[in-house]
Amino acid sequence: MAVSTSFSGAKLEALLFKSASNSSSTRNLSSSHLPGFCKSIRTRRILFQRTGVSSFTPFKCELASSDVLVQNDEIDPPKSSNLSALEQLKTSAVDRYTKERSSIVVIGLSIHTTPVEMREKLAIPEAEWPRAIGELCGLNHIEEAAVLSTCNRMEIYVVALSQHRGVKEVTEWMSKTSGIPVSEICQHRFLLYNNDATQHIFEVSAGLDSLVLGEGQILAQVKQVVKVGQGVAGFGRNISGLFKHAITVGKRVRTETNIAAGAVSVSSAAVELALMKLPEPSHATARMLVIGAGKMGKLVIKHLVAKGCTKMVVVNRSEERVTAIREEMKDVEIIYKPLTEMLSCTAEADVIFTSTASESLLFTKEQVKDLPPVGHDVGGLRLFIDISVPRNVGACINNLEDVRVYNVDDLKEVVAANKEDRLRKAMEAQSIITEESKQFEAWRDSLETVPTIKKLRAYAERIRTAELEKCLSKMGDDIPKKTRRAVDDLSRGIVNKLLHGPMQHLRCDGSDSRTLSETLENMHALNRMFSLETEIAVLEQKIRAKVEQNQK
């Protein structure tokens, strides 16, 4: 990857010194509490969140500047100077092969950096992902996009024509759609670029970034991103390739390591939390109510059964899903109730699990305060375990004396116990992720030669056609078709023979880094020798076209 040169040396040096000073305490905290492996994953999140500087690539100027450009007016260039980063880059003579290409960027907020109160406002339902992709790709500096929105994270992946401008536009879009001020989003978000972004989605897919390390549900959610993205124009080649490769990595990690062995899911952690809060003698007798029979609700039911629960009430919009679950678990008494009877069922329950896609609260303080008290055999407290995002249960209910509400952020208490063992297993997974990240970046680099191949062939074809016409005109109009065809075939054969060598040097599958480096050097050499259009000009044209389209 070439280094962008958007900043002068003095300004860059000052910025890096300031960022290093600000992040020193964070580094000390990370190293003192986490093992080496965990530090390599988490430090990247923390440093991006607080400084915008990657601990791995401190000399990526746009990367180092992206957070500051959005939030700090002192470092923004004067408004009178409207030179874009691309124009500055064109005049730079740092490296004869230096150029800027589209960057993969992730703008994210997760359970590690952001409270559930903010995540629920930013959450995008799966049905809205295509619309969100369309709106994101309508921004001036965004080419491709994908949305990964779960109960633990809200992450937007984009291919940006300019890093800091793309981040600024996406952050403003997030603010507009959620109603959260840009400044507040910037306090909690993390930013990752190119290889760091690649490693992040691979870690996510492998379950290394989950609250419950190694859990399998996130892989299904990554698959769903690809499924929903198929046919959506903005889910382009780079983003599609990234997520498909992430699925491969997630499968490989689970196959080649034992990270998934004994791992708990969010649903099982919710059940464990409920049992931790109940007196042990009441585990078999507590009255259980599950609201929502979707994927999460079904898993809650399965884990309750695994813990010895033989009777429960399930409230759902329709009976069809509950019937299907009942067929799977014929030895368990599962009683279906419609949503209209939700409050009456709650009055008769000791523990209530909520896992619906409702965007509004199902339970408010006014609804719960008049419910009859629960027995002392279950501790005298009615428990609400809310694993929905947005939340289904109002936090103010916790103010009632005989009620306790727990949400997904409270599950950390459960997973802490067996996290150390899975961290050891995760070390094995990290080597796989590093290897796969290199392969993906090499594949992406190899794509750069495709436009040059097309341009070189088109250039040769223009010359062939022009010279063929000259030849045929000199031969006269009465030449036989057979002769005309033979001359045409001759010209094509000569061109193909001449192009064979250069084309071979431009084709690379990305598997060999040495070959890839030579291929990219050959590409730049051919661009210069034949005055082919440069990648910088392509980026400028794309940005100009998007701006003009948005102004119509």
From Swiss-Prot:
Location, primary (coarse class): plastid
Class in the EC hierarchy, top level: oxidoreductase
Active-site residues, Swiss-Prot/TrEMBL: 151 (nucleophile)
InterPro entries hit by this protein: 4pyrrol_synth_GluRdtase (IPR000343), 4pyrrol_synth_GluRdtase_dimer (IPR015896), 4pyrrol_synth_GluRdtase_N (IPR015895), GluRdtase_CS (IPR018214), GluRdtase_dimer_dom_sf (IPR036453), GluRdtase_N_sf (IPR036343), NAD(P)-bd_dom_sf (IPR036291), Shikm_DH/Glu-tRNA_Rdtase (IPR006151)
SUPFAM superfamilies: Glutamyl tRNA-reductase catalytic, N-terminal domain, Glutamyl tRNA-reductase dimerization domain, NAD(P)-binding Rossmann-fold domains
Record-level GO cellular component terms: chloroplast
Entry-linked HAMAP family: Glu_tRNA_reductase
Functional description taken from the UniProt entry: Catalyzes the NADPH-dependent reduction of glutamyl-tRNA(Glu) to glutamate 1-semialdehyde (GSA).
Protein name per Swiss-Prot or TrEMBL: Glutamyl-tRNA reductase 1, chloroplastic
High-level lineage: Eukaryota, Viridiplantae, Streptophyta, Embryophyta, Tracheophyta
